[in-house]
């Protein structure tokens, strides 16, 4: 959808972007990056599914802001969700849950069984952070090297 056809006061368009905004990341001033990750939550998993749920629900939001009327025109885009992060999150969540259960049952963090799982979870978290950092660097580089 082109910006000229976008009506912020109309029915939200389900186009796979946050708020149904019509901007491509390559031309936006702000790119929203999703992190489908909930490996280390201690009470109930599910946050990893939030990016898709928020994208879907966000088309129902109104854009009126008396302090920044028309701010959406500046260009807010949605980067593609990297679903490999969700897959890693689901896989590592099993290890994290076992560690949490072990500790809640009075187990020790130094047990060999737990140390291996914690190491895998920590390595996965480092990889996830690196992924998000690389995505941000990509969009920042594009933003600051593309002609205005």
Predicted regions and their residues:
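N-terminal glycine-rich anion-binding loop in soluble enzyme alpha/beta folds
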Residues: 2-121
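Glycine-rich anion/phosphate-binding loops
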Residues: 129-130
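N-terminal small/polar loop signature for handling phosphorylated ligands or for N-terminal nucleophile
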Residues: 137
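Conserved small/polar residues in nucleotide/adenosyl-binding loops
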Residues: 144-148
């Amino acid at each position: 959808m082109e910006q000229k056809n976008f009506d912020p006061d109309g029915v939200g368009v389900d186009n796979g972007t946050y708020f149904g905004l019509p901007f491509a990341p390559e031309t936006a001033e702000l790119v929203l990056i999703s992190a489908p990750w909930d490996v280390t939550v201690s009470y109930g998993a599910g946050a990893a599914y939030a990016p898709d749920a928020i994208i879907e629900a966000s088309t129902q939001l109104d854009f009126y802001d008396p302090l920044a009327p028309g701010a959406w025109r500046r260009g807010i885009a949605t980067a593609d969700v990297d679903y490999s992060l969700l897959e890693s999150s689901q896989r590592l969540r099993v290890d994290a849950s076992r560690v949490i259960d072990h500790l809640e049952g009075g187990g020790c963090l130094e047990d060999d069984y737990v140390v291996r799982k914690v190491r895998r979870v920590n390595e996965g978290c480092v990889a996830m952070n690196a992924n998000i950092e690389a995505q941000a660097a990509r969009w920042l580089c594009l933003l600051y090297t593309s002609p205005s």
